[in-house]
């Protein structure tokens, strides 16, 4: 079976990108007779004594009138070895955003350089953009070598300069080829003009370049696009989740987790356009059926239980600014489109602007203008499910949309989570002399979430007493109590709350590992906080139960056992959940407690949940 290679051309204006594509299409017999006749006639009308191959792809009237490429032109052609989709991108600096669009799906980029001019700023810019976009294969095509008499020294100088620049980028595969796109030398077949060049022709290289290893087949990521419920007599119980596999391989029977809620289940069936399939991999569009009835909607994601994306509202990214009449400034609000999820976001900060020529980081920059690149920090209103772009381009890329004009203003690539705390490589775990068999059975963690005053601590303490009366070792690990010691250094910003709950989660797993049944009353207002707690327990092999104390805000405020609501309403305290800080209701808690039942009844419901899971 022939494989498909997506490629794009890049480089400065008039370097010959459109001519090169025209040559590839013509020599591979991919130009229709009537189209070729039109190109020949237009060339004659302009007084050329040759056929202008650039006209094959320059389809807009403005392009033909000016002899330049403005929009991105996509063309398809094939050889016996491989199929190709090629994007002809513009070279003018004001159309850099178009180049980003054209190259965003490419697996290989051909960077054309006019041999007479050498490397120009725009050529460097495009090569750098290609590396940012995660493109692993670059071809340096030094064009118009015929105008320099096929000077080997000139070619070697340009090649060495480009390779020195590429060495500073994250690109491993760079191939340099001397060509003449107009005359076809070294484009489809090797040329007699370059006996000193021992490499392949351009087309031969495109046919043979290895791309099978570029796809991420390890990290299962399935963003849900649509929930299928036929509502017919024949399929009245059918529920499946449609989308495109972003990465990894899914098979029927696999254990998976639904994010951001963190529920685990199994795949029972996978359906493709023509019926059931044994497995699904990128870029297949399929629908997935699960063993359990879970509340899943567009924007959620299915992943492996022990291989999950980062769930966060705060992240750093490299962005390319594309707006003509606006600039990117910290504090501005935008819409983020990421996989199948669309959320509001704010630019929390601009770390630096990047000079693509020198790769210098200008930390004094206060804004990004058209075609400029920089590193920014973003905060979204609801969590996103992210991977680092270099690891997974599908879940590591996004666009920014202006909410006023609905126009795309930036393309972004998610960077590594530098805030994530990882142990030093010099820190080694100590193995206990006591084995798991010597200890009491592992305990469990019950995580109580809800607004302040919803009854979390009251129910948890009553459950603790009832369990101790039954001879079961139970302990209430109260988040407020930890703030008097271990977490005394933390405030109530979202970042500090996330760290507070991270520490709380790890302490809970240690207690549960000793055989205690741990009861954790903690507001944990965001879904990402609760998902993090569940993940920490899953990684430690500890059973985790989420209990939602579903007490309405007005009831909590009426109770106000600590007087905090009154202080929040008076403006004496800020970042108070339910007043000036959000609370995201759990979609699928393991247990929902409502105030229409007494505290004693609620405590018994929790105990019943634990006993049913034993």
Curated annotation (Swiss-Prot):
The residues that hold GTP are 11-18, 88-92, 143-146
| Assembly notes | Heterodimer composed of CysD, the smaller subunit, and CysNC.
Q: Which Cys pairs are S-S linked?
A: none
Annotated family: In the C-terminal section; belongs to the APS kinase family. In the N-terminal section; belongs to the TRAFAC class translation factor GTPase superfamily. Classic translation factor GTPase family. CysN/NodQ subfamily.
Catalytic residues at 524 (phosphoserine intermediate)
Q: Which residues bind ATP?
A: 450-457
Pathway noted in the entry: Sulfur metabolism; hydrogen sulfide biosynthesis; sulfite from sulfate: step 1/3; Sulfur metabolism; hydrogen sulfide biosynthesis; sulfite from sulfate: step 2/3
Q: Where is this region: Adenylyl-sulfate kinase?
A: 442-614
Question: What is the name of the gene encoding this protein?
Answer: cysNC
Q: Which species expresses this protein natively?
A: Mycobacterium tuberculosis (strain ATCC 25618 / H37Rv)
Q: Where is the composition biased (Basic and acidic residues)?
A: 587-597
User: What CDD domains has UniProt attached to this entry?
Assistant: APSK, CysN_ATPS, CysN_NodQ_II, CysN_NoDQ_III
Q: Please report the name of this protein according to its UniProt entry.
A: Bifunctional enzyme CysN/CysC
The annotated region (G4) lies at: 143-146
Q: Which Pfam families match?
A: APS_kinase, GTP-eEF1A_C, GTP_EFTU
Q: Where is this region: G2?
A: 67-71
EC number per UniProt: 2.7.7.4, 2.7.1.25
Q: Induction of this protein: by what?
A: Induced by sulfur limitation and oxidative stress. Repressed by the presence of cysteine.
């Amino acid at each position: 079976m022939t494989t498909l290679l997506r490629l794009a051309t890049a480089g400065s204006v008039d370097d010959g990108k459109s001519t090169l594509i025209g040559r590839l299409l013509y020599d591979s017999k991919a130009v229709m007779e009537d189209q070729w006749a039109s190109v020949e006639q237009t060339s004659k009308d302009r007084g050329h004594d040759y056929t202008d191959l650039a006209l094959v792809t320059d389809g807009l009237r403005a392009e033909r009138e000016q002899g330049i490429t403005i929009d991105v032109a996509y063309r398809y052609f094939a050889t016996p070895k491989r199929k190709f989709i090629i994007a002809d991108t513009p070279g003018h600096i004001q159309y850099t955003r178009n180049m980003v669009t054209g190259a965003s799906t490419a697996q290989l980029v051909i960077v054309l350089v006019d041999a007479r001019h050498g490397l120009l700023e725009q050529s460097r810019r495009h090569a750098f953009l290609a590396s940012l976009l995660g493109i692993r294969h670059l071809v340096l095509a030094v064009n118009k070598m015929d105008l320099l008499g096929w000077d080997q020294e000139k070619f070697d100088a340009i090649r060495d300069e480009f390779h020195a620049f590429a060495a500073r980028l994250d690109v491993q595969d760079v191939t340099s080829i001397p060509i003449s796109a107009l005359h076809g030398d070294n484009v489809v077949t090797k040329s007699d003009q370059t006996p000193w060049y021992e490499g392949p022709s351009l087309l031969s290289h495109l046919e043979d370049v290895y791309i099978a290893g570029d796809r991420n087949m390890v990290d299962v990521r399935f963003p849900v696009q649509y929930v299928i419920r036929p509502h017919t007599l024949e399929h009245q119980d059918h529920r499946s989740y449609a989308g495109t596999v972003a990465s990894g391989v899914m098979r029927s029977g696999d254990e998976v987790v639904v994010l951001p809620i963190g529920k685990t289940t199994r795949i029972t069936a996978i359906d493709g356009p023509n019926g059931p399939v044994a497995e699904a991999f990128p870029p297949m569009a399929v629908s997935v059926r699960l063993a359990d009835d879970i509340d899943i909607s567009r924007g959620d994601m299915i992943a492996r239980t022990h291989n999950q994306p980062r769930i966060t509202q705060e992240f750093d990214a490299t962005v390319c600014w594309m707006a003509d009449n606006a600039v990117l400034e910290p504090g501005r609000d935008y819409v983020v489109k990421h996989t199948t999820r669309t959320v509001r976001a704010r630019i929390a900060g601009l770390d630096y602007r990047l000079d693509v020529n020198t790769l210098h980081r200008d930390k004094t920059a206060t804004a990004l203008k058209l075609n400029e690149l920089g590193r920014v920090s973003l905060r979204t209103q609801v969590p996103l499910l992210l991977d680092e772009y270099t690891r997974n381009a599908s879940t590591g890329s996004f666009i920014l949309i202006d909410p006023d004009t609905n126009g795309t203003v930036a393309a972004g690539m998610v960077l590594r989570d530098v805030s994530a705390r990882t142990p030093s490589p010099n820190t080694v775990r100590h193995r206990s002399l006591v084995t798991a068999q010597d200890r009491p059975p592992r305990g469990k963690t019950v995580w109580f979430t809800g607004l302040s005053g919803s009854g979390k601590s009251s129910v948890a303490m009553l459950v603790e007493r009832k369990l101790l009366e039954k001879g079961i070792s139970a302990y209430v690990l109260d988040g407020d109590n930890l703030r008097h010691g271990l977490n005394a250094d933390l405030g109530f910003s979202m970042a500090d709350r996330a760290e507070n709950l991270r520490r709380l989660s790890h302490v809970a797993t240690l207690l549960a590992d000793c055989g205690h049944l741990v009861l954790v009353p903690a507001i944990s207002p965001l879904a990402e906080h609760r998902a993090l707690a569940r993940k920490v327990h899953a990684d430690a092999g500890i059973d985790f139960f989420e209990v939602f104390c579903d007490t309405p805000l007005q009831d909590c405020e009426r109770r106000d056992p600590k007087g905090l609501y009154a202080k929040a309403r008076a403006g004496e305290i800020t970042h108070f959940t339910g007043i000036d800080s959000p609370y995201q209701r759990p979609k699928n808690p393991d247990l929902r407690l409502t105030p229409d039942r007494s505290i004693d009844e609620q405590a018994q419901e929790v105990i019943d949940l634990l006993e049913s899971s034993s």
